Amino acid sequence: IGQNQRLAKAHSKARELIASGAIGKVLTFRTIFGHGGPETWSIDPGSNVWFFDRSKAAMGALADLGIHKTDMIQYVLGAKIVKTQAVLTTLDKRDATGSLIGVDDNAICIFEMDNGAIGTMTASWSYYGREDNSTVVYGTEGIMGIYADPQHSIVVHKKDGGTLYYDTDAIQTNAS
């Protein structure tokens, strides 16, 4: 799998800032990748998209989207996942017959990192209206939002009240 989120300039800059102590020791984080689902952008759009077929895809939103955020958070934090818990479910997506699809359309994982930080990763195919491809990292000296602000790639809110803005690039999107 090509881990394309590592190539995003804001993720590289965030990694550099975190390693330099810009937000102190990382305590917790949340990372999200959610959109309206592959039927809205795939080469074979609609309710018969291969992503929904368990015999072809095996897994859903977790494998499609979550794998990228799982890799990205380890890259940005410079830490490895040592323990995880997950809930995968199908809440809304239906196939051409009207039945719930055979793979997950939503997944939430709790990660424990080898540096002691804990956080969540959410992958969803049922974020209707606007894609969310953001990460927020909470440290002892501040909070870093990565692609969480519509105007700035990275925003760091410092414990002392200061705010730093970094404009590197826009996040990749599946939006039409």
Predicted regions located by residue number:
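C-terminal helical cap and adjacent loop that interface with cofactors, partners, or active-site loops
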Residues: 116, 135, 145, 163-176
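Short, charged/polar low-complexity linear motifs in solvent-exposed/disordered segments
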Residues: 18-19, 43-44, 136-139, 163-164, ...
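Intrinsically disordered, low-complexity segments enriched in small/polar residues
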Residues: 22, 58, 140, 159-160
